[in-house]
Amino acid sequence: MELTVEPIDIGTERPVVLLNCADAETLGVHSLDRVEIDWDGTTEVGIVKVTDELVAAGRIGASHGFPEITDGTVVAVTPAGQPESVESIRRKLDGRELDSDELGAIVADIEADRLSDLELSAYVCASHANGLSLEETKQLTERMAEVGKQLSWEQPVVADKHSIGGVAGNRVTPVVVAIVAAAGLTIPKTSSRAVTSPAGTADTMEVFCPVEFSREEIRDIVTETGGCLVWGGAVDLSPVDDKVIRAQRPLSLDPPGQVIASVLSKKQSAGSSHIVVDIPYGAGAKVTSLSEARDLADDFRRVGDHLGLTIECALTRGSDPIGHGIGPVLEARDVLAVLEGEGPEPLRIKSLRLADIIFDMAREAGMPVDDRSAADILDSGAALSKFRDIVAVQGGDPDVSRDDLQPGDRTETVTADTDGLVVDVDNQAVSQLARRAGAPNDHGAGVVIHRRTGDKAVAGDVLYTIHAESSDRLEAAREYAAGDEIVRVGGRDEALVERR
């Protein structure tokens, strides 16, 4: 059947076509079926959506996923079958183990946008419900890395650090990168933006400087400073992972095997050789127990060995937020404070421990490393100087101060109702509160924690402050805070929460 193209102004992750009901019936296709579209020697496959009114009979609506088709182009449209990888997804749903070829086909079809949203979601759910074996995780990681753009380095040791996330205010990466680069090691850090959190490392660094660079620009930055703090999404290190993450987001699914494949495929594409993986565990974190964290760490190391990567895992307590601030500007202030010798002690200590692990790994590999400890490098001001160098080369102001980094001016303070000890700071709730306030899109939005677990509190003491950039966002955050105990103070009458 020949149809005339009509561009449709809808953004889609993959090529989608709109067919009038009459044309769909003639072709024998339904919504979520596929059609092959041929024009001028080009062939594309689109996923069908059927409509009564949005396009007329004889025309075919083309989404933004078809950038090369112009208005009025006449195309030949024929029904197309499902990709072969759909059968492999069915096998995984049945609890079968997939081989390297099957996983490779799934990765290739995700990368080429040949799977519908429903099929990709089925793959994610199958991986979550039935798990990925160690062998599947190894093969999946390898295949995901193969389709990404590659960075390569001349140095025998290229350091990296990654956290699996789940802890509010865990902004150790800029501090670690500054310390490690100041010690003379190479650490090209590509980071993510927030998916479900109030700030990713890239969002926080964007407060200081641009973070989107080409691979050539990243190489120049690292050559000049020894490190970088950039957004990995701009260089397509693991495009399949980015698409899988978007499919996981609505149900907050994070299968352990997929987590490992996500992290290590990006690290291999980035050219990293020695990687410390931060695995926070505890109430409210992604990993809830120490035994679960140990199992995940063992699998990280086994998959790393398969890929030729040296992996060390740091199992860290993740029940409480790490910094005082949650949200891009507030976390940036904490980073600068730690680099200046002040700031939240948990953020300082964790950064030092992770940097020292990297130093140990480099020394074991025979690399000449600064004899000083991470604490000595931080306390000497060398890490602050290196951080300012990186900010400058990435196009930011090297003289930026904490006073320059002002959070949103719409504020609300929440105080203790009783005397006692802070017995819990809810990681998930405080992250959700910061998002309600506008983070990460509003860089100045977020939450400042004034009392941590174990601190004494007297009735009337400020427990936390909400910052927003608009009154509407502040009101949304205020309503959320009123319905949850973000920071819990336990007194003698703790058993009775309230009377209603």
UniProtKB/Swiss-Prot annotation:
Gene that encodes the chain: deoA
Alphabetical list of SUPFAM superfamilies matching this protein: Nucleoside phosphorylase/phosphoribosyltransferase catalytic domain, Nucleoside phosphorylase/phosphoribosyltransferase N-terminal domain, Pyrimidine nucleoside phosphorylase C-terminal domain
Signal peptide, first to last residue: none
Record's protein name: AMP phosphorylase
EC number(s) from the headed UniProt entry: 2.4.2.57
Entries under SMART domains matching the protein: PYNP_C
SS bond partners: none
Keywords in alphabetical order: Glycosyltransferase, Transferase
Known role: Catalyzes the conversion of AMP and phosphate to adenine and ribose 1,5-bisphosphate (R15P). Exhibits phosphorylase activity toward CMP and UMP in addition to AMP. Functions in an archaeal AMP degradation pathway, together with R15P isomerase and RubisCO.
Coiled coil regions, renumbered to chain: none
Location of the active site: 254
Domain of life: Archaea
GO BP term, example: pyrimidine deoxyribonucleoside metabolic process
Family label: Belongs to the thymidine/pyrimidine-nucleoside phosphorylase family. Type 2 subfamily.
Catalytic activity, as annotated: AMP + phosphate = alpha-D-ribose 1,5-bisphosphate + adenine; CMP + phosphate = cytosine + alpha-D-ribose 1,5-bisphosphate; UMP + phosphate = alpha-D-ribose 1,5-bisphosphate + uracil
Pfam families: Glycos_trans_3N (PF02885), Glycos_transf_3 (PF00591), PYNP_C (PF07831)
GO cellular component, one term: cytosol
InterPro entries xref list: AMP_phosphorylase, Glycosyl_Trfase_fam3, Glycosyl_Trfase_fam3_N_dom, Glycosyl_Trfase_fam3_N_dom_sf, Nuc_phospho_transferase, PYNP-like_C_sf, PYNP_C, Pyrmidine_PPase_CS
